[in-house]
């Protein structure tokens, strides 16, 4: 998993551009919960989906 993928990080889904920008809510093992602008909260498996890191919340 990308070391930048941690709570508060801003990400995009590589195959779902329509979901918009997402903010990582939690990371537990390979499970990442992200709150996307247009898709709401989604639980993703980082072994299956490699999220694109956009930046930090700060």
Per-region residue spans from a language model:
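Basic/aromatic-rich interaction segments and small domains that mediate binding to polyanionic partners
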Residues: 2-58
């Amino acid at each position: 998993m990308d070391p930048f993928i941690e709570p508060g990080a801003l990400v995009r889904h590589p195959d779902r551009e329509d979901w918009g920008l997402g903010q990582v809510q939690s990371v537990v093992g390979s499970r990442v919960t992200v709150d996307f602008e247009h898709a709401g909260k989604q639980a993703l498996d980082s072994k299956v989906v490699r999220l694109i890191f956009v930046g930090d919340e700060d």
